[in-house]
Curated annotation (Swiss-Prot):
Gene3D superfamilies: Aldolase class I. It comes from the Bacteria. Its EC number is 4.2.1.20. The active site is at 49 (proton acceptor), 60 (proton acceptor). The gene is trpA. SUPFAM superfamilies: Ribulose-phoshate binding barrel. This is Tryptophan synthase alpha chain. Keywords: Amino-acid biosynthesis, Aromatic amino acid biosynthesis, Lyase, Tryptophan biosynthesis.
Length: 268
């Protein structure tokens, strides 16, 4: 069975939502990044959302831009990232793993080659932040050819037509934006999202995970109470990495504590 579907069904049976942390692979370096991803899963993450380092991350605020710079400075390449992700996949065969990235990285490898490499590494889904549904045909075709879910963003300003496309084209989960703008924990997530969730359900969309500005357990609880299948937290996780760069043990402990507190807020 599909890993996302299996995870959402298991969580529903346990009356829980999903908590999904985001990190940039190879931040702050490949060796520690592997430990970070492992720590997130051990602490209770239901899935991982991973960034491949890129020199010009348009939709990201300063926190995730910093992660990209650290990773690139440590010598990160897409191949090193795929190798690390493959190691996490081997250790956690049932864990949904998604990429969140930019089209340039896909184009530079060739669209088909890129998705084939994702499939080889055991990646379940790819969200390309700068490709809207109406420009996505080539990406969706390649993703589906290699058994990778194409993920789409449902922004708060979306028309019914956009939400319909997101629902029909997407697989795995739907990335529901809690607000417009760039990523960052400084800007709190806006609730309510009930109307959006009702429309996505009406269009039979994949389960919605709420992202952007999720940094506290209370926000996770609100997202799930509103009807989302779970929440994604990126900048808040990366901030913990950023603030413990010289003390890896303290970093891993702080990450574990954060994930565990966010995960405990998913119980319905």
């Amino acid at each position: 069975m599909d890993r996302y579907q299996a995870t959402f069904e298991r969580l529903a049976a346990q009356k829980q939502g999903a908590f999904v942390p985001f990190v940039t692979v190879c931040d702050p370096n490949p060796e520690l990044s592997l430990k970070i991803m492992d720590t997130l899963v051990q602490a209770g993450a239901d899935a991982l959302e991973l960034g491949i380092p890129f020199s010009d991350p348009l939709a990201d605020g300063p926190t995730i831009q910093g992660a990209n710079i650290r990773a690139l400075d440590s010598g990160a390449t897409p191949d090193i990232c795929f190798d690390l992700i493959g190691q996490i996949r081997a250790k956690y065969p049932d864990l949904p793993i998604g990429l969140l990235m930019y089209a340039n990285l896909v184009y530079s490898r060739g669209i088909e080659n890129f998705y084939q490499r994702c499939a080889q590494a055991g990646i379940d889904s790819v969200l390309i932040a700068d490709v809207p549904t109406n420009e996505s045909a080539e990406f969706v075709a390649a993703a589906e050819k290699f058994g990778v879910h194409p993920i789409f963003i449902a922004p708060p300003t979306a028309s019914d037509e956009t939400l319909k496309q997101v629902s029909q084209l997407g697989g795995g989960y739907t990335y529901l934006l809690s607000r417009a703008g760039v990523t960052g924990a400084e800007t709190k997530a806006n609730m309510p999202v009930g109307d959006m969730l009702a429309k996505l359900e009406q269009f039979n969309a994949p389960p919605a995970l709420l992202g952007f500005g999720i940094s506290e357990p209370e926000q996770v609880k609100q997202a799930i109470d509103a009807g989302a299948a779970g929440a994604i937290s990126g900048s808040a996780v990366v901030k913990i990495i950023e603030s413990h760069l010289n003390e890896p043990d303290a970093m891993l402990t702080a990450l574990a504590n954060f994930v565990s507190s966010m995960k405990s807020a998913t119980q319905k």
